[in-house]
Amino acid sequence: AGGIAEMSHMGHEIREITDALDAAGNTTAAIGKGFAISSAAFVALALYGAYVSRVAIPTVNILDSRVMPGLLFGATLPYWFSAMTVKSVGIAAMDMVNEIRRQFQDSDVAEGRKEPDYESCVIIATRAALQQMIAPASLVMLSPLIVGILFGKYTVAGMLPGSIVSGVQLALSASNSGGAWDNA
């Protein structure tokens, strides 16, 4: 809201009001992110307990040679997923940039005499969002299956807590840095 007020050259008093609203919104978002991350962590732990119970593993010893590789691999999964997601956003953004460049080659659009084709931009964004998330989603869904088939239930019992702990730390870090960037 503050950016819109500034770009539209509204008075200083309007900007003060929008700054207060922005601060309230940022605080609410930060609290909401904390609750979301915490609840996701607890749900993941509950699902892990259900997995261990279902496959009848009496105890999970992290020093076991079948568990430790899974723990290390699981710890890398959230970072791998995040890297794939960020790369996907870059690819989708370039698709959009290329479409906008194509439209601005029409001098009528560039000079404001003709409306741009907004629908093609929406289609590109939707298609890119769906296509580019196939690989990251496959990583998340197929990793436990592949690890379980190749290495067994004990390695999966290591992989899952590795990804839970690493994922929570990554989520907290991303939430805090995102909040800092938002307020910069």
Descriptions of predicted regions:
Residues 1-184:
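Hydrophobic packing and interface segments
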